[in-house]
A protein has these predicted regions:
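Alpha-helical elements of Rossmann-like donor-binding domains used by nucleotide-donor carbohydrate transfer enzymes
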Residues: 62, 78, 87, 99, ...
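Beta-loop-alpha module in the N-terminal Rossmann-like domain of NAD(P)-dependent dehydrogenases
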Residues: 67-128
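Rossmann-like dinucleotide-binding domain that binds NAD(P)(H)
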Residues: 176-228
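Short catalytic-loop micro-motif centered on adjacent basic/acidic residues
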Residues: 90, 111-114, 138-142, 211
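A contiguous active-site-proximal alpha/beta segment in oxidoreductase catalytic domains
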Residues: 118-176
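Short active-site oxyanion
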Residues: 47-51, 86-88, 138, 185-187
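Core-facing hydrophobic residues within beta-strands of well-ordered domains
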Residues: 47-49, 163, 207
Length: 228
């Protein structure tokens, strides 16, 4: 008689500790948060994740149990009032993000969000002005500029002098996938913006003019895979 195989549980992540730490609270316990942000914060000795918030109770408990997060909430306002974090990660759909981000900033917490930081350019400007008014730091997940390869490229650009013209291409497999947040984001703001940010970082200065185009290379299967 065959033995039943035991269900494997995901191991609890051991957190690094530091004498000097930043109190962090997270809004969102979905796929992007758990696959990227929670693990990254667990690797930072200075990051003390004190609480997390999500409307999905099961998802919240699963994430908090895995990463050893003590505070668990369904209301982010209550979480901020009780936990008093130094910074808040708001990892959520862009069409819900503006009001939450503005509220977090007005409460005096530093803010970190996924891209795009808002649905419109004007909303983004307003958040920037609000952050300046309240003296808080804000950040958006443009992590490619921290890649050793990109940093080396930045060094070479600075050594060679002023960049007058630059070009970037971005390819994305999208076979059988639904639109981002049912159309709440497009390909540029969701993914292609990484190429824009990397180009700006490499070149430095401010952009004076832009020319861009996009097209679909239709195929019934994934025919390209690129990563950086």
């Amino acid at each position: 008689m065959a033995k039943k195989s035991a269900t494997k549980k995901k191991p609890t992540v051991k957190r690094r500790k530091s004498k000097k730490s930043v109190r962090i609270a997270l809004i969102g316990a979905g796929g992007r948060s758990v696959s990227t942000h929670y693990p990254a914060l667990s690797d930072l000795a200075e990051a003390n994740v004190v609480a997390a918030c999500d409307l999905d109770e099961n998802r919240l408990q699963t994430a908090c149990n895995r990463f050893g997060i003590p505070g668990r909430y369904s209301d982010y306002r209550q979480m901020i009032e009780r936990e008093k974090p130094d910074a808040v990660y708001a990892i959520m759909p862009p069409h819900h993000l503006y009001d939450v981000s503005a509220d977090i900033i007005e409460r005096g917490c530093h803010l970190f969000v996924e891209k795009p930081p808002a649905v419109t350019t004007e909303q983004t400007r307003q958040l920037a002005l609000l952050a300046e008014k309240h003296g808080v730091l804000t950040g958006v997940t443009f992590q490619r500029r921290f890649s050793p390869l990109i940093r080396r490229g930045k060094q070479q650009c600075e050594e060679r002098g002023t960049v007058h013209t630059a070009h970037a291409s971005f390819y994305k497999n999208w076979v059988g996938a639904d639109a981002y947040y049912k159309g709440g984001m497009d390909m540029l703001t969701a993914d292609g913006i990484h190429a824009v940010d990397t180009l700006r970082y490499l070149c430095g200065g401010e952009v004076e003019s832009v020319a861009a185009d996009s097209r679909r290379l239709d195929a019934g299967h994934c025919n390209i895979h690129l990563a950086l």
